[in-house]
Amino acid sequence: MTEGVLINENEVESKLEAVIKPGSFTGENAGEMAEVILIPKKAIDIKLEADVITPDSFAGKSAEEIGKLSVWQGPKTYPLSEFFEVTGNGGSSAAETLIRIKGDAMRIKRIGESMSAGKIEIEGSAGMHVGTGMKGGELVVYGDADSWAGMEMTGGLLHIKGNAGDHVGCAYRGKWHGMKGGRIVIEGSARHQLGGGMDGGEILVEGDVKSFCGIRQNGGLIFVKGSALRGVGAEMAGGTIVIGGKIERFSPGFEFVSMENSITSGEVELIGEFKKFTGDYAISKRAKGALYVVADTNPEL
């Protein structure tokens, strides 16, 4: 699912078209960017905590200074250069800094945490908490992303070209409010509790999701082009969920409202034949969540 294009599923049961506008999630374009390249030196056994890998941290620093930034491995800190060959200097600002990780980063956590501008490209998979707390900029993962991707992000674009784990765009453990802004695009599938506690922003999934997509959702849009297992919108109080495929087990707290032929939410416009439900009334009779399902793929609802 790419931005600014039309998705047409007329060759399958579900007839659904989606126009996704690029939006302004990444902030102003800084033009030509200074590029910092990180090349892994060795296989990583114990996972790294590398929240310093952001355009904000690299901006204004030379390659040597970037290499001296500290990362955690277990109870110890090491310089970034212990694990990466660093080439290139940061730009004069975060918006003018591009970080390119040339290799797999599945055992590196917290890449892009709280970044406000600029761009990160990971030429492989990414570890847990990638893009957590993003405020702006663009982060592209060319492989898969582990769990907690985009947790509590407020802005920016997180683009995962592979699959994603559990708790994408969700709230931190013990908190009730997850993602508040920005956009997450997943070209593959995602696992459990996508958008848990989501307050705003957009999550767009090309493939399928597992259980409890949109659990405790309060706002924002979740659009899943594929199917969902069960518990969609459980404890939902607000926001919008659209499922293009089949929901295997429908949540009992939702009531049918009407048939709709288009849905518009922010920069996303969906065209098709939808059944609209509201809920989750199993939790509160004042709930205002909207759940849309494509009629052709859910004839029994």
Curated annotation (Swiss-Prot):
<feature type="repeat" description="5">
    <location>
        <begin position="195"/>
        <end position="207"/>
    </location>
</feature>
<comment type="pathway">
    <text>One-carbon metabolism; methanogenesis from CO(2); 5,10-methenyl-5,6,7,8-tetrahydromethanopterin from CO(2): step 1/3.</text>
</comment>
<dbReference type="GO" id="GO:0018493">
    <property type="term" value="F:formylmethanofuran dehydrogenase activity"/>
</dbReference>
<comment type="similarity">
    <text>Belongs to the FwdC/FmdC family.</text>
</comment>
<dbReference type="Pfam" id="PF01493">
    <property type="entry name" value="GXGXG"/>
</dbReference>
<keyword id="KW-0677">Repeat</keyword>
<comment type="subunit">
    <text>This enzyme is composed of six subunits; FmdA (65 kDa), FmdB (50 kDa), FmdC (34 kDa), FmdD (17 kDa), FmdE (23 kDa) and FmdF (37 kDa).</text>
</comment>
<keyword id="KW-0484">Methanogenesis</keyword>
<dbReference type="InterPro" id="IPR002489">
    <property type="entry name" value="Glu_synth_asu_C"/>
</dbReference>
<feature type="region of interest" description="7 X 13 AA repeats of [GW]-X-X-[MQ]-X-X-G-X-[IL]-X-[IV]-X-G">
    <location>
        <begin position="112"/>
        <end position="245"/>
    </location>
</feature>
<feature type="repeat" description="7">
    <location>
        <begin position="233"/>
        <end position="245"/>
    </location>
</feature>
<feature type="repeat" description="3">
    <location>
        <begin position="150"/>
        <end position="162"/>
    </location>
</feature>
<feature type="repeat" description="2">
    <location>
        <begin position="131"/>
        <end position="143"/>
    </location>
</feature>
<dbReference type="InterPro" id="IPR017550">
    <property type="entry name" value="Formylmethanofuran_DH_suC"/>
</dbReference>
<comment type="function">
    <text>Catalyzes the reversible oxidation of CO(2) and methanofuran (MFR) to N-formylmethanofuran (CHO-MFR). Can use N-furfurylformamide, formamide, N-methylformamide, and formate as substrates. This enzyme is oxygen-labile.</text>
</comment>
<dbReference type="GO" id="GO:0046914">
    <property type="term" value="F:transition metal ion binding"/>
</dbReference>
<dbReference type="GO" id="GO:0019386">
    <property type="term" value="P:methanogenesis, from carbon dioxide"/>
</dbReference>
<feature type="repeat" description="6">
    <location>
        <begin position="214"/>
        <end position="226"/>
    </location>
</feature>
<feature type="repeat" description="4">
    <location>
        <begin position="176"/>
        <end position="188"/>
    </location>
</feature>
<keyword id="KW-0560">Oxidoreductase</keyword>
<dbReference type="InterPro" id="IPR036485">
    <property type="entry name" value="Glu_synth_asu_C_sf"/>
</dbReference>
<protein>
    <recommendedName>
        <fullName>Molybdenum-containing formylmethanofuran dehydrogenase 1 subunit C</fullName>
        <ecNumber>1.2.7.12</ecNumber>
    </recommendedName>
</protein>
<feature type="repeat" description="1">
    <location>
        <begin position="112"/>
        <end position="124"/>
    </location>
</feature>
